């Protein structure tokens, strides 16, 4: 929802115009990292952008506005965003059925596969369908969850900042980030999340056999498995093979 809702300073249309004027866009994404020799994963929320050196100050200002000042309480527009996201995801899944099938299949095998499917695959689409069709009953939970989540995520101790830039332009980046860190400090002081009430979520990974019917002319069948207990396969060869076959 970040970047698609109003902020305390701009409407979502004004914010979109500003970001396109000063940058090549500001995006956010969830990255899933498997831990070595463990079935657990780490989730990292990325906010990224690209811009010219002369516009980095305004771009970082808008990035901070999106992260710290997004307003989730516009129920009418929130419902529009949910419906639009549902529609876009359906088209994407239909156009990449092979990827959707593999993602759904892996969700029943591994924790990282589950998170991947429920953040961008059929699992996520099922959630959006239920949310869209029962929005009035779910909207308060959604709004409160988003507000509490940004408070818990955007903390200085959780944050890693990186930049790719020429040496002569690095001073501009440091200046912009100094202002960003100040806004982050203000956000933390104003919005202290009660992290003691937050529990680590552990997905219920269960193998399942499922079929989906679509109007597509091509049928995809996906079968998944895990080789974590197979000796001599964790030397990187399987990772290389996966990229060769994809």
Where are these regions (language model features)?
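Short, hydrophobic beta-strand segments
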Residues: 1, 45-47, 221-225
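Sparse, context-dependent recognition of short Cys/His-centered cofactor- or disulfide-binding micro-motifs
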Residues: 4, 32-36, 41, 146, ...
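Acyl-CoA-dependent O-acyltransferases
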Residues: 167, 184-238, 242, 246
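Charge-rich, well-structured scaffold segments of protease-associated domains
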Residues: 14-200, 246
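Active/ligand-binding-proximal structured segments within catalytic/core domains
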Residues: 1-18, 61-64, 232-245
């Amino acid at each position: 929802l970040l970047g698609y809702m109003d902020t305390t300073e701009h409407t979502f249309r004004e914010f979109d115009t500003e970001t396109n004027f000063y940058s090549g866009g500001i995006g956010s994404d969830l990255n899933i990292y498997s831990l070595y020799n463990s079935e657990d994963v780490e989730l990292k929320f990325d906010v990224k952008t690209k811009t010219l050196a002369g516009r980095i100050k305004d771009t970082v200002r808008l990035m901070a506005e999106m992260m710290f000042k997004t307003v989730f309480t516009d129920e009418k527009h929130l419902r529009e965003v949910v419906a639009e996201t549902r529609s876009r995801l359906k088209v994407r899944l239909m156009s990449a059925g092979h990827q959707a099938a593999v993602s759904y299949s892996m969700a029943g095998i591994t924790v990282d596969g589950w998170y991947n499917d429920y953040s961008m695959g059929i699992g996520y689409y099922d959630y959006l369908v239920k949310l869209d069709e029962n929005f009035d009953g779910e909207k308060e939970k959604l709004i409160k969850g988003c507000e509490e989540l940004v408070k818990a995520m955007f903390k200085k101790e959780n944050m890693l900042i990186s930049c790719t830039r020429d040496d002569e332009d690095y001073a501009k980046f440091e200046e912009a980030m100094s202002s960003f860190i100040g806004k982050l400090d203000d956000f933390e002081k104003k919005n202290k999340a009660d992290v003691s009430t937050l529990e680590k979520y552990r997905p219920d990974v269960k193998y399942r056999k499922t079929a989906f019917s679509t109007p597509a002319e091509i049928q995809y069948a996906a079968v998944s498995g895990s080789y974590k207990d197979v000796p001599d396969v964790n030397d990187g060869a399987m990772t290389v093979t996966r990229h060769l076959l994809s």
